[in-house]
Amino acid sequence: VLQWAKTVEGVDLPVVGTVKPWQFTFFIVGFPGLILALFFFLLREPPRHRPTVAPEGGDNLWDMLRHVFANASLYLPFIAIFCYMTIIAYSQGFGAPLFQRTWGWEPAKYATVNAIVLLATGPFAVNFAGWLSDRWTSRGISDAPVRIALIGVAIIIVTGVAAPLVPNPYLAMAIYGANTVGIAFVSAVGVTALLNITPDGIKAQLVAFYYMCISMAGLFIGPPAIGLFNDFVFGTDGIRYSMALVPALFGVPVLLVGPYVLRRYREANAHYESLGQG
C-alpha cells in the first residue's frame, strides 16, 4: 500500500472527498474490519453465572467504579500487566525510523518485512496462548491466564531490549518476531483473565474500563517515552537505545509485582468458585 501511495497524488472517495494517498492507506487497512464487525451481530449473548457487584444489585457505571476501587489491590496491578503490553506495542510505531536510522531501510521495506513477520507469528501466538490457557485451566491451574501474560511480559522484555541493539536488521526483525509472540501472549488472555474475576452485572463496563486504561497507557506513555529519550538523552541517531530502554524500564516492575498479582488473582477466583459460580 505504501509503495502504491507514492505513485498517486490523491484519491477521490464518495462523501469523504479527495484524500491524500497516505490517508487512503488507512481506509484500505481498516475496511476489512468493518466486514468482520458484521459477524458480531450473529453472536448470541452468553449465559450469565456470576453474582451482581453489590448486595442491592447495582450494575451502573458508579457501581463498577466503586467495585474497582474497593478492590484496587487486585485490579490495578492486574491491569498494569496489560498496560505494559500496549506501551511496548505502541512504542514500536517508531520501528520504521529505527530501521531507517540504524540500518538504512526505507519505510516501505520495513513495512513489508514487518507485515510478513506479524502475519507469520501473531495469529499462531494468539491462538496458542488461548489454547494453552484453556489447557492449564482444565488441569486446575486457576491463574493460568495471568501466568501466560507474565510469560509474555518476560518475552517482551528480553526481545524488546535485544532487537534494537543487534548489528543486523534481519536478525533484529527476527527478534521482533519473537517480541510479537510475547505481545500476543499478553493480549490474548487479558479479557479472559478479567472476566474470571468480575461479577456479571459489571462485566461489559469493566471490560470497557480495561480497554480504556490499556489504550490510554499505550498512547500516552509508549510513543512519548521514546520521543523524550530521543530528545533529551540519546539524540535522534540514538533511537535504538531509546527503543531498548523502554521495554526494560517499564517491564521489570511488572515482573516484580507478578507474584503478588498471581496470589490476589487466585484468591479472587477462589472467592467466586466458593459462591458456586462457574
Where would I find each of the regions flagged by the language model?
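Helix-loop-helix hairpin linking two adjacent transmembrane segments in secondary transporters
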Residues: 1-41
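Short extramembrane helix-to-coil loop segments that connect adjacent transmembrane helices in Major
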Residues: 8-9, 15-18, 99-110, 233-237
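C-terminal membrane-cytosol helix-exit motif in multi-pass small-molecule transporters
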Residues: 30-52, 254-262
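Flexible cytoplasmic inter-helical loops of multi-pass small-molecule transporters
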Residues: 41-63, 269-276
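Extracytoplasmic gate region of multi-pass secondary transporters
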Residues: 71-129, 183-187, 191, 218-226
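A late C-terminal transmembrane helix in Major Facilitator Superfamily
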Residues: 122, 197-234
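Helix-to-loop junctions at the C-terminal end of transmembrane segments
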Residues: 125-141, 230-231
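C-terminal transmembrane helical hairpin of 12-TM major facilitator-type secondary transporters
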Residues: 142-190, 247
